Amino acid sequence: MRMLSGQHVLDIGSGTGTLALLIKEKHPGVDVVGIDPDTQILEIASRKARRVRADIRFDLGYADRLPYSDSSFDRVVSSLVFHHLAPETKVVALREAWRVLRPGGELHIADVGRPRSALMRVAVIPFRLFDGFGATEHNLAGRLPDLIMETGFDDLAETGRVMLGIVCLYRAVKPRVTSGNRRTSHN
């Protein structure tokens, strides 16, 4: 993921800050904000950032109610969050990501996807046991890319797979101009 100095990046479901810290380490000139609903986890993230003197802000909040202005980020990232969300919450969270992204901004999601083989179907069982069969079903059925496109994003690409192919890496772009017939977060 290419980022330019001065860009603003939001990490939705930042947890202990691992992804936010990695982004800041690789791109020290970007402004990184993490958001997570767990205060104890955010305290850990803040300590980790202070320990390495990384200027990262961590905010308390939810993916489906982002406390940020419209068009305030150049990139929105999320790692292993969406498979925890109920289908209707996934939709609202994607609309919120769309809302806070600037036109031309990119969404990057790493999350459990549709298994492509019998081995992968077996490999996702621990995710399903830990996170619940209902929560993960939507992702395993391959619905996340459809939801991303239905939200109004363009240029959706699966850019790779990691963790034995269980986790899909998706990239999509908020259009610079939205047409009247395009489904957006406001429709």
Predicted features and spans:
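Conserved alpha-helix/loop element of class I SAM-dependent methyltransferases that forms part
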Residues: 1-5
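A short SAM/SAH-binding and catalytic strip from SAM-dependent methyltransferases
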Residues: 75-88
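Short glycine-centered segments of the SAM/dcSAM-binding site in methyltransferase folds
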Residues: 8, 104-106
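A short glycine-rich, Lys/Arg-flanked "PGG" loop and its adjoining helix->strand segment in the class I
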Residues: 91-103
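C-terminal alpha-helical "lid/dimerization" subdomain adjacent to the S-adenosyl-L-methionine
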Residues: 25, 108-151, 155-168
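A short acidic, Gly/Pro-enriched loop at the edge of an enzyme's catalytic core
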Residues: 64-75
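Class I SAM-dependent methyltransferase SAM/SAH-binding core
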Residues: 10-12, 16-65
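C-terminal lobe and adjacent flexible extensions of AdoMet/dcAdoMet transferase-like proteins
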Residues: 169-187
